[in-house]
Regions:
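Beta-propeller domains with acidic blade repeats across secreted/periplasmic ectodomains
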Residues: 1-308
Length: 308
């Protein structure tokens, strides 16, 4: 059968906090586990390639597909480039998990990755760099603070680390260390990470880090990030939300232009590719949820007018 994975636009047309309109931006994709929005389209992972889907006529559906780069390893698909995150310069950080060996030919020369780490793609120059090299299982979560410092999740374990030490160009095969910044109240596995940067949320929590957990704890932990030479440490602040629904699987979270927080719930009874048969009928391929978190005692932010 033909690929039919989708990128959907969910729109709240009457500003009541609930989506009431759905548009299929793309409906012919194959496992798009990482994407980042551009002003005229979307950068998305497609098998072993980074692809740009461009909307040329403004109808919220892509018209042109351009393969920007190929050669990313995808033989173990859930480790392939994913969890895209734009840094302050507009470059896209792309995560890659263990067991993969990527060799990407670019106009600036080949870029290689082995056994986990991060690539950085600059859309303006079309330059790809091996951004950081770590042996990490599933880095399903990258967040960038107000100063451009990047933190990332290890996912299979409980750890969260600072990315900068892995940017050192080490000798081939060297296993650079990624010290864990979380001291207490950490649960595995993790998926989805975000810095609090919203005038809708209280002043005292700005700069905190939010971390989703989806098996050992069904919710999100909130930690204060503290500067500590030569990097950072953290201090547990609170559980931001938790669910009694055993199928609640928060996998991503991001702040919206109005200051509210959106949380993606995979909503699945089964999780993991080793524990259950891939064709187990209890795997839910059709349902998911998106929650919107607000802070009632503070007003929402008036979004900036981008177009029109």
């Amino acid at each position: 059968s033909k690929p039919d994975d989708k990128l959907l636009i969910l729109e709240d047309t009457n500003s009541d906090g609930k989506a009431d309109k759905q548009i299929n931006f793309a409906d012919d994709l194959h496992i798009p586990i990482g994407f980042e929005i551009a002003h005229d389209g979307v950068y998305v992972s497609q098998s072993g390639s980074l692809v740009f889907l461009q909307d040329t006529d403004g109808d919220d559906k892509y018209d042109q597909r351009e393969v920007l780069l190929s050669g990313f390893d995808d033989h173990d698909t859930h480790h392939a480039i994913s969890s895209f995150c734009a840094d302050p310069s507009g470059a896209i950080i792309m995560s890659e998990g263990i067991f993969l060996h990527s060799h990407v030919e670019t106009a600036f020369g080949p870029q290689r990755g082995s056994n986990g780490g991060f690539f950085r793609y600059d859309p303006r120059t079309r330059r790809l760099l091996r951004h950081a090299q770590f042996t990490i299982p599933n880095p399903w979560g990258v967040a960038v603070d107000a100063y451009g410092q990047e933190l990332f999740l290890h996912t299979s374990g409980t750890s969260m680390s600072w990315m900068l030490p892995g940017m050192v160009k080490a000798r081939y095969g060297a296993n650079l260390k990624a010290p864990d910044l979380l001291k207490t109240n950490k649960v595995r596995p993790t998926s989805g990470i975000e810095f609090v940067s919203s005038r809708h949320f209280p002043d005292e929590v700005q700069g905190d880090i939010l971390i989703n957990n989806n098996i050992g704890y069904l919710g999100a932990k909130q930690h204060k990030v503290i500067d500590q030479d030569p990097g950072f440490t953290t201090e547990y602040r609170q559980d931001l939300f938790v669910s009694k629904d055993l199928n609640f699987r928060p996998t991503d979270l991001e702040f919206a232009p109005d200051g509210s927080l959106y949380v993606v719930d995979w909503q699945n009874a089964l999780i993991g590719h080793m524990q259950h048969n891939a064709r187990d009928p209890n795997r839910d391929h059709k349902h998911g949820r998106i929650y919107r978190v607000t802070y009632p005692s503070r007003p929402l932010v008036q979004p900036a007018k981008i177009h029109g």
